[in-house]
Amino acid sequence: MCRYSRTLIGFLYIACGTGLLLIALVRTVGSAQPAQPGIHVEILGIRNSIGAVACALFEAPEGFPTGYLRFATNIMMVKVRATKATCDFADIAPGTYALAVIHDENRDGELSTNWMGLPQEGYGFSNDAKGILGAPSFEAASFSYNGESLKMTIALQY
């Protein structure tokens, strides 16, 4: 085999390897997943990993926030992992919504209160809405959703 043949073969190996590397890089960069449509909620301020987090999505004021079992458009229970939780609502039509979230530590499906009616478990609302001597109104917690990907955070209070 002549000297030029070995050089040519070596060059082809290098060129081929570089080409495959470039193809792999382009496929990796080009395959980044776009954000999925839906409402993606990160729950902050969870004090422990006991129980679950309940996220209730409402599209009307009726039943907000305490009547979530009857009136919520979507309800999601997610396990708390290392004091973190995320609720991802998919297939949601564009519109106006409000979110209510509780940290259901005892997993009884409701916000536990003491003898005075004060919450003993964590709770929070979209827009960080707060009520005066009670839960906030739907209007205070409401937000517009356009059908694309919406990310929000809700900080719990205890």
Language-model features: locations:
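Short, flexible loop/turn segments at beta-strand junctions in immunoglobulin-like
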Residues: 89-91
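Short proline/glycine- and polar residue-rich coil/turn motifs
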Residues: 77-83, 145-146
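Short amphipathic beta-strand segments in non-cytosolic proteins
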Residues: 56-76
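Bacterial N-terminal signal peptides
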Residues: 11-27
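N-terminal secretory signal peptides that target proteins for export/translocation
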Residues: 1-9
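Acidic, divalent-cation-chelating loop motifs in proteins
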Residues: 102-106
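A short tyrosine-centered beta-strand micro-motif
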Residues: 95-101
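Primarily secretory-pathway and cell-envelope proteins
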Residues: 2, 27-61, 110-158
